């Protein structure tokens, strides 16, 4: 977060605005990740884990409530006070936030498609449905982000992936998939950073 704020500041974006933008992005990313995971549970079919997690459907309305502009503004100003920044009132409409949430939902589904082909590149047997993979990788990212103890959720994200993927793959295969995903993400991040730095 601090890195994004710093780089935005170098481009002339006020620190308060960039901080609010990054905070909103992460909030939407977390809420959408949880919602996508919960909404894809019916695609688990007869998998043992899927039938035991239907109680998480209650998180759907909870996530939508947390995105109400009044609560978002309150949480944002709390974060600004903690960091010693002046408070601000952002006039976000609920429809705007829900639209952004929908776009993040599409992102997680595309992420599931990408991981389907990533797994297919190293594993030739049958794979879980794409919605299941989308939900697994979404909630694994959320778990890694919320851990706050390791950079980029290192270890926590992989552990979550291995646990959830092990309902469909042998544990050693799930472990390889988790590591392969981390490697691909790291290479992608470095490539994007190199391109941005060069421009």
Question: Where in this protein do the model-derived segments appear?
Answer:
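Transmembrane helix boundary and interhelical junction motifs in multipass membrane proteins
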Residues: 1-4, 143-162
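Predominantly cytoplasmic-facing regulatory/coupling regions of multi-pass membrane proteins
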Residues: 41-145, 170-199
């Amino acid at each position: 977060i601090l890195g994004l704020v710093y780089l935005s500041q170098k481009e002339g974006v006020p620190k308060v605005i960039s901080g609010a933008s990054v905070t909103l992005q992460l909030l939407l990313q977390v809420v959408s990740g949880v919602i996508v995971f919960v909404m894809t549970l019916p695609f688990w079919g007869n998998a043992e884990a899927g039938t035991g997690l239907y109680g998480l459907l209650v998180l759907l309305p909870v996530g939508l409530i947390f995105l109400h502009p009044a609560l978002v503004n309150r949480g944002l100003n709390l974060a600004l006070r903690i960091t010693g920044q002046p408070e601000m009132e952002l006039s976000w409409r609920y429809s705007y936030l829900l639209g952004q949430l929908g776009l993040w939902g599409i992102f997680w589904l595309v992420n599931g498609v990408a991981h389907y082909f990533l797994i297919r590149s190293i594993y030739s047997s049958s794979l879980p449905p794409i919605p299941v993979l989308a939900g697994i990788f979404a909630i694994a990212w959320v778990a890694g982000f919320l851990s706050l103890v390791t950079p980029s959720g290192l270890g926590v994200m992989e552990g979550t992936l291995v646990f959830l993927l092990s309902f469909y793959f042998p544990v050693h295969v799930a472990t390889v998939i988790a590591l392969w995903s981390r490697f691909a993400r790291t290479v992608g991040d470095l490539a994007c950073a190199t391109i941005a730095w060069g421009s």
